[in-house]
A protein has these predicted regions:
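Extended, charge-rich alpha-helical interface modules
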Residues: 1-80
């Protein structure tokens, strides 16, 4: 993963609202393309959600991240 891409995404996500972060997550549902930029994007997105105290366990187990389903934010928890 390219740290420059990660840092750029991390800075962008830090400035976003939680609603915007959830919308960004949902925008990735069904996207099967993968490269180093996508890896940086996904990691920065999940890291920002976790940094804000959001429970992401419905989509991330610490190793595997799933964009199989749209999510909603409910009581600071991502819910499928």
């Amino acid at each position: 993963m390219n740290n420059s891409f990660y840092n750029d995404f991390a800075a962008r996500f830090a400035a976003c609202t939680l609603t915007s972060l959830v919308e960004t997550f949902n925008g990735q549902v069904g996207n099967r393309g993968f490269n180093s930029m996508r890896a940086a994007h996904d990691k920065a997105l999940i890291d920002e959600l976790v940094r804000r105290g959001v429970d992401v366990s419905a989509v991330f187990d610490g190793t595997t991240l799933s964009f199989a389903h749209h999510v909603v934010l409910d009581n600071n928890c991502l819910v499928i």
